[in-house]
Amino acid sequence: EFLRPLFIMAIAFTLLFFTLHIMAMRNEIWRRRIAAQRRLAARMASREE
């Protein structure tokens, strides 16, 4: 009787952990892409001068 909610919450927290972990990875990928684009834009701007 008491184990059922425990298992449900364990599954819910596991899914929450993986969801937040995947979101953090996506944010890191976007952050690196933006940084790379800024570096490329700075290189292109320095070549034009």
Curated annotation (Swiss-Prot):
Chief location category: membrane
Entry membrane topology: Multi-pass membrane protein
Disulfide-linked positions: none
Subcellular location field: Cell inner membrane
Family designation: Belongs to the CcmC/CycZ/HelC family.
Protein name: Heme exporter protein C
A GO CC annotation given for this chain: plasma membrane
Primary role: Required for the export of heme to the periplasm for the biogenesis of c-type cytochromes.
The keyword Cell membrane is annotated on this UniProt entry: yes
Keywords per UniProt: Cell inner membrane, Cell membrane, Cytochrome c-type biogenesis, Membrane, Transmembrane, Transport
GO biological process: cytochrome complex assembly
